[in-house]
Amino acid sequence: MTALIEEIRQKISDEQFEFSKHAVDKSIVRKILVREIREAILNGKIIEDYPDDKYGASCLISGLTQDERPIHVHCSYPARPLLKIITSYEPTLQRWNDDFTQRISTNNE
């Protein structure tokens, strides 16, 4: 997955990305800035891979902003001309381990 994250980072560095409507709506509600999404991707790592997702191959990236805010970014694979940011959110310790890279199983899931 090293090559995959490098390709994603290159798309971000080259400004070759776009946001889904869902990503725009949720980032406003969650008060996540475009800058923070960029920082999380550029500093992050792929923690979940969805190669067979029904809307196209995608992955979940966990990273920190310059202010040390943890952010998860769900994005498409970089095969398309513009990388699609599907959604972003700030993970919580109720659902993730202390470095926000592994889900915690709950009885509800």
Predicted regions: what they are:
Residues M1-E109:
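Ribonuclease/tRNase effector modules and their secretory precursors
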